[in-house]
UniProtKB/Swiss-Prot annotation:
GO terms for molecular function: mannosyltransferase activity. This is UDP-glycosyltransferase TURAN. The lineage of its organism: Eukaryota, Viridiplantae, Streptophyta, Embryophyta, Tracheophyta. InterPro entries: ALG1-like, Glyco_trans_4-like_N. Disruption phenotype: Pollen tube (PT) overgrowth inside the female gametophyte (FG) without PT rupture. Premature burst immediately after PT germination. Dwarf plants accumulating anthocyanins and dying prematurely in RNAi conditions. Impaired accumulation of ANX1 and ANX2 proteins. Pathway: Protein modification; protein glycosylation. Pfam families: Glyco_trans_1_4, Glyco_trans_4_4. It is a single-pass membrane protein.
Length: 465
């Protein structure tokens, strides 16, 4: 495909935290037979499938970290200086360091200075220019500066102006496709996020090995000594919090805690406080019901509410603030752990969990959380914050539940985990729905049907011009 047989994927961010662009690179190499150059920042380690593919070449840019030490009063000046440094660096990589490609595929946002640099490079090197719209960059900037700020207006103009210059466009939802078409003059093709093949339910052996590997992370509570700490102190070598190994046989513990996973970027568009408030409500209600059940004539299995372990993955600016809040909660039936997992272990964690929680609300209201797609790939049902287009992904009552407040989330936790692990029909029903959703589509198929025809078209268009 193409005269040069080469594609360049541009991510002005941490490649390891940009899974969709990693999947694009893999598909360009596997399904379109391109040599693929990725220009991105370093930081987190990408998936081993990307690192080990002989046709994928990663070019790592250095981040202008010194800017973070500027005083906050100079924030607008800092933004402009950072954009100028990034622009200069991008021009060097895209004009000089990377071999000339047939196509540049760029993630948006960030829009400034990425779209300008890639547009210039595509014109200079006679390559197609495709934008993958994940969200709108100006809406993210507006979270910190406000919608009426002059810089936000300039950012939106630049995003619109250069976005319209693309040879082709992809986007993540039908709602975003409609917005781009009606208000931006951009004709985009929807490429839904779909889980790749390594997101699947974990085998018992994989669960046991995973929890052996993360035992050190689980041993360290956030602040107070909790039920997880007590349980781990008394464990035998052949057991984990969730599994027991006897000779070669591995089984799930009947008295295990329920495992709830949430992945967050610890940013203002994800209100983590909702989850903390719901955890407090669950803890208090379970404590009260446990006390009442001492005299009530109700079977233990029917009345049982498990302890909950929330494992929160991700990196971001508000992590320490929320960890301080967790330290002050002093919960008896709920525990929290924060961790950052290897790219190969994250799917195993999702495939071992009982429930996922998504707090993503979207700065634009037009994108969908990829973390939920990954959860469905692992057959994991999700409780998600409700917003304008989330119904394109989460079908309330079928593969997950939608909530708008912490009290709604607390109610959902009580409903889903009543009778856990053996007598929780509501949870099992959602799990079946999540399995069905996850198995109905995979990234390679979606990319072949939606992205590949567009890429073939724009590459041919440039080659013939």
């Amino acid at each position: 495909m193409g005269k040069r047989g080469r594609a360049c994927v541009v991510v002005l961010g941490d490649l390891g935290r940009s899974p969709r662009m990693q999947y694009h690179a893999l598909s360009l190499a596997r399904q379109a037979s391109f040599q693929v150059d990725i220009v991105a920042y370093g930081g987190s380690i990408p998936h081993e499938a990307v690192l080990n593919h002989p046709s994928i070449h990663i070019h790592t840019m250095a981040q202008p970290r010194f800017i973070q030490y500027f005083p906050k009063i100079l924030y607008p000046v800092t933004l402009l200086l950072k954009a100028f440094i990034q622009f200069t660096m991008l021009l060097w990589f895209l004009f000089v360091k990377v071999p000339a490609p047939d196509i540049f595929l760029v993630q948006n946002p960030p829009s400034v200075p990425t779209l300008i640099a890639v547009k210039w490079a595509s014109s200079w090197r006679r390559a197609a220019f495709v934008v993958d719209w994940h969200n709108f960059g100006y809406t993210l900037l507006a979270l910190s500066l406000g919608r009426n700020n002059l810089l936000v207006s300039l950012y939106r103009w630049s995003e619109n102006h250069y976005g319209k210059m693309a040879t082709g466009s992809l986007c993540v939802t039908k709602a975003m496709q409609h917005e781009l078409d009606q208000n931006w003059g951009v004709r985009a093709k929807v490429l839904y996020d779909q889980p790749p093949e390594f997101f699947r339910p974990a085998l018992l052996e994989e669960r046991h090995e995973l929890f052996c590997r993360v035992r050190k992370d689980l041993c360290h509570p956030i602040g107070v000594y909790d039920f997880i700490s007590r349980e781990l102190e008394n464990q035998e070598l052949n057991e984990t919090l969730f599994t027991t190994k006897f000779n070669a046989d591995i089984s799930l513990k009947q008295n295990r805690p329920a495992l709830v996973v949430s992945s967050t970027s610890w940013t203002p568009d994800e209100n983590f406080g909702i989850l903390l408030e719901a955890a407090v409500m669950y803890d208090r209600r379970v404590a009260a019901r446990s006390k009442g059940s001492e005299t009530a004539e109700i079977s233990e299995e029917q009345h049982h509410y498990p302890n909950l372990l929330f494992i929160i993955t991700g990196k971001g600016p508000e992590k320490e603030m929320y960890e301080e809040k967790i330290k002050r909660l002093n919960l008896r039936h709920v525990a929290f752990r924060t961790m950052w997992l290897a790219a190969e272990d994250y799917p195993l964690l999702l495939g071992s969990a009982d429930l996922g929680v998504c707090l993503h609300t979207s700065s634009s209201g037009l994108d969908l959380p990829m973390k939920v797609v990954d959860m469905f790939g692992c057959g994991l049902p999700v409780c998600s914050v409700s917003y304008s287009c989330i119904q394109e992904l989460v079908k309330d009552g079928k593969n997950g539940l939608l909530f708008s407040s912490s009290s709604e989330l607390a109610d959902q936790l009580l409903i889903l985990f009543k009778g856990f692990p053996g007598n929780c029909d509501a949870l099992m029903s959602l799990k079946a729905g999540a399995m069905e959703t996850g198995s109905s589509g995979r990234w390679a198929t979606e990319w072949e049907d939606c992205a590949k025809p567009l890429i073939t078209q724009v590459v041919s268009q440039i080659a013939d011009s």
